[in-house]
Amino acid sequence: MPTISQLVRKGREKLVVKGKSPALKESPQKRGVCTRVYTTTPKKPNSALRKVARVRLTNGIEVTSYIPGVGHNLQEHSVVMIRGGRVKDLPGVRYHIVRGTLDSVGVAGRKQSRSKYGAKRPS
């Protein structure tokens, strides 16, 4: 426990809060190019083949991001937009690809939560 004079001289060190999506550098979204599109298996109680992509962002950082929705058209060299938001059962996946922007098409036949998957209104 420091004395009062020690606190006057040095003060307390501020705790540094680490962000959840550091690669975005305080931006809401970032553009990037897919370097690899593949599937991964999730953590223990779950079982599936989750679609993910390695994306090199415009600021030079390479991140792993999740491709949401059923089916996608992404391949290597596709230009995509990423946003923050982790996938709980995929370790190291802290970003989502935004569907319906740039080279990523929206989910076909989607009727509910359309705005989250870039689907147009059914006519």
Swiss-Prot record:
GO terms for biological process: translation. Keywords: Methylation, Ribonucleoprotein, Ribosomal protein, RNA-binding, rRNA-binding, tRNA-binding. The keyword Transmembrane helix does not apply. CDD domains: Ribosomal_S12. One of its GO terms (molecular function) is structural constituent of ribosome. Transmembrane segments: none annotated. It comes from the Bacteria. The keyword Nuclease does not apply. GO terms for cellular component: small ribosomal subunit. The modification 3-methylthioaspartic acid is found at D89. Belongs to the universal ribosomal protein uS12 family. With S4 and S5 plays an important role in translational accuracy. Interacts with and stabilizes bases of the 16S rRNA that are involved in tRNA selection in the A site and with the mRNA backbone. Located at the interface of the 30S and 50S subunits, it traverses the body of the 30S subunit contacting proteins on the other side and probably holding the rRNA structure together. The combined cluster of proteins S8, S12 and S17 appears to hold together the shoulder and platform of the 30S subunit. Part of the 30S ribosomal subunit. Contacts proteins S8 and S17. May interact with IF1 in the 30S initiation complex. This is Small ribosomal subunit protein uS12. It comes from Myxococcus xanthus (strain DK1622).
